Amino acid sequence: MDLQREIDAAVERGGGVVRVATGEREVLPFVLKSNVTLELADGAVLLASTNIADYAAALGERCFVGAEGATNIAIVGRGVIDGRGAVFREIGGLKGESQPQALPVLMRFTRCRDLRLEDFTYRRGAAWGCHLKNCDGVAMRRVKCFNHVNNTNDGIDIESANVTIEDCDIDADDDAIAFKTESDKSFAVTNVTVRNCRLASCCNAVKFGTGSYADFRDVTIEDCSLVRAKGNHRFNWWKSIPGVTNRICGIAALALEVVDGGRMDGIVVRNIEMDGYQTPIFVRLARRRDPPAGAETYLRNVLIENFRGVADSRIASSITGVPGLRPRGITLRNVSLVVPGGGTEADAAAQVPEKERAYPESFMFDKMPLPAYGFYVRHADGVLFENVDVKTASPDARKPFVFDDVN
């Protein structure tokens, strides 16, 4: 099936619907264009080419499904987009590129407006599953993702504004949903809602960062389940993280990170059920990279409420800044957690390194459990805990809360 030819023909007619009937078809990478809807029938499967030479980076970056600068485009229906990404595992050094650069993203939408994604499944990408890059106006509903075959198998990467994601099931080896501000360091991720979704990851279920050069503003995550992934290709944390209690688990259920000079303001996370992560909550403001001269970087005005879950390691939740950079205005309300326990007197007395320029993860502090079993807070202002309860499944010598340089 020459899908690109059919899309181009629809454009010549002024737009319309391109229908893919039931059945499997190997398809070359293609580009959606303005006013075109791709409709995948129930039982239709688009199989991505497994020849890297077919991914000629027509849009500047390799992807199977692409669009750039398009308006009023959609992918709908109950069919499947299959990246067959496992065959790309060994690719590296292509024209001097590293593996993540060389591997094609399954779907990438760049600077598009009025994008609609509904009801289909995407799976087995070579790299990221769906990259929403500097778009304005995105609705994703009832979409399923299963991305567990390769490096950097994120579910959704959001660098866009005015986005609604609801009733979706995202299961990924890397982050399930990652908000980033790195492709265009002046583009703000703002006015985003993620609602009523199942999010599963072997890394972070919901992550802001790591790329954090610009603004994250007015983002709401609500009524979601952050749960254990159903697959695991890359990560065996039980081998490298002391005290991990399950062979398949993620790093953090919720990770809020500003480490590249960006800004975060007005984040709401509420009505969350969590299971299958080493650490429930990780908040980090640091200076992996310095902001431009004279620019301000901050992480402030975060509300986390009605958050319940069971953790899979002794690594506590944390809210940390570094000297000169302090998260502020962080409220946790109605939070109920069960953690494994097992912390020792040595854990309670441990000195936590600053790691100002380190890559941020909840285990970044030399993989130590941290001096608290509940929350460790350092270099922060205006942190409010209201009706927060942390129980241990076994005895623990640490305190539930430890505060260091906190106002």
Where are these regions (language model features)?
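Extracellular/periplasmic carbohydrate-active domains that bind, remodel
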Residues: 1-407
